[in-house]
Amino acid sequence: VPPIRRDAPVKTGSTVKDGGAIFYDSHMHTPLCKHAYGEPEEYAAQGLRAGLRGIIFTCHCPMPNAFWPTVRMDEAEFDAYVAMVGKATQKFKGKLDVWLGLESEYYPGYEKYIEELHQRADFHFILGSVHWQSKEYLGKFENGTIEGFRRTYFNHLADSAESGLYDCLGHPDLVKNYHPDSWCFPILKEHVSRCLDRIAATGVAMELNTSGLNKSYHEMNPGNEFLGMMAERGIPLVIGSDAHRSARVGEHFIQALENAKAAGYKEVNYFEWRKRKALKLDAVLESLKKYEAAKAI
């Protein structure tokens, strides 16, 4: 990992005037991940159209040793990532907050690399994800039953929270897309409950990822019962579209907020300079519904 930057700029907060949009889409990508399309400015323009106050880019982090290289930026592209987000930040200053984040891999044994990576730029938000789809993960952990593999995934999700490396855990039940036809949450509920207890003890947030509606198991990540278990434990909630195309910025956010409210949540969150900021869920829902109504006129 290259050395830590020593020329960090003075940190400033939101440049958007109060009184309008209030919420942030906290998960989206850039073409550097090799499977997303459109420049950051296009995502920002869609953020304005979606009635958001800001967006946070969380492109897939670089990894050493050619770890699943087809879905992430190369290590040599990291500075270009920081620069391209920074360019959009300046272009939309005063209109929409465009902030730098990172979707960081959790894979046992790479913690030191990830810790050092997080020091290379001034991030607003670090989203930790366990990606069971990688050949590395499948090769090491797919060595028993389907349910056993899923339990291993949830163990790693809790491990990632306990590592202290991440602000929030991304798409927490992503593993339901592993043999989706056999997914049965009640079978795993007790195990998930224990893992959520571990996560709740850390104070780390968890994401409600709306892109699950576009995956093989057609449901947000997590599903509603899982979401309710998070709410019962007081686990802070962040919402992200996981947009890989600009048109999906802010997609399904009203439905996501309604799901969260039904699950028992009263607040939703975003991160600024890696500090969690809470908003009243009803206020966020009202702001987005008003914006949708105004567009329809």
List the predicted regions and their residue ranges.
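Charged catalytic cores and adjacent phosphate/nucleic-acid-binding surfaces used
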Residues: 2-30, 40, 182-297
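An N-terminally biased module of ancient metal coordination in phosphate/nucleic-acid-related enzymes
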Residues: 4-104, 108, 178-179, 184-187, ...
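Hydrophobic faces of well-ordered beta-strands that scaffold small-molecule active sites
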Residues: 24-28, 55-57, 98-102, 126-128, ...
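A structural motif
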Residues: 52, 123, 165-166, 235, ...
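Extended substrate/RNA-proximal surfaces in nucleic-acid metabolism proteins
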Residues: 68-202, 283-297
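Non-catalytic positions within long, well-ordered alpha-helices that form the structural scaffold/packing
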Residues: 44, 48, 119, 161-162, ...
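Flexible loop residues that form catalytic
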Residues: 60, 131, 174-177, 211, ...
